[in-house]
Amino acid sequence: MTSSSIKEHQQVLALLSDNPKYLEIFSTYAPAHKFIEAVVKPEGFSFSVNDEDGSRFSMALGSDPVVLDGDEIATSRGLQMDSQRYKTQVSWDLYSIVTESFQTFEPAFESSDYSEIDNFLKTHARKSSVWPGNEEVLFWGEIRDQGLLVATGALVQWRTGQVMFASIATHSDYRSKGLAQKLVSQMLGNASRSGITRVGLGVFAENAAAKRAYEKVGFALIGEFTSYQKLSQ
């Protein structure tokens, strides 16, 4: 490994070949056309990218990474940041799963009623990250009970090419019934049959119930992070 700045995306991929978790994080959040630089060393790994809005996003992973400058920075949870320069935003976890074992699962019904999904999310999951009309969405899955939409979620493909779940939501009257697990499992079957081999998932750190549900499906924890916003000087 090296501790000097690396400007070639392919070189970073090669250096991370023996660290699958760092490799997956980098592949998820650092598209080649937006990549700026990375620093790889035994005690940590960091990289920065240009975001769509022109700002800079960076990640700092491990016990003692080089913290690259960024308007928004995500670090391994527990890493101390200068509170005079950065404001804590949110803590979240990244999970991942291989889809092959879901290939024979009952397929998820795919929804095209975007108005219904929009109203559902506004009522039952207002903090959803992805909404109908988002160009990254591959499809919306759904579960119904006698015609009533009771669970929905999106499979999206990010600019890195990584496929992720987003906006998994259950009707407030139908929670704790395993519907999110069922929907995600069925959607993984759809993904596998369409040639998608791995799917990721981000969860707020405090959402213990959701994390337990996804772990029961088979999702593996890739990393635990805290995001920070750079304060105006």
Where are the language model's segments positioned?
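Short amphipathic alpha-helix that is part of the acyltransferase structural core
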Residues: M1-E24, S91-S128
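N-terminal charged segments
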Residues: M1-L79
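Glycine-rich acetyl-CoA-binding "A-motif" of GNAT/NAT acetyltransferases
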Residues: G44, L148-A151, A209
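Hydrophobic alpha-helical segments and helix pairs
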Residues: D64-A108
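Conserved acetyl-CoA-binding loop-helix of GNAT-fold acetyltransferases
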Residues: D64-D69, T170, S176-R193, K211-K216
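Conserved GNAT acetyl-CoA-binding A-motif
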Residues: L68-G78, A191-G202
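Conserved active-site alpha-helix within GNAT-family acetyltransferase domains
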Residues: G78-T88, Q181, A205-G223, L231
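A conserved beta-strand-loop-helix scaffold within acyl/acetyltransferase catalytic domains
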Residues: S129-F139, R144-H171
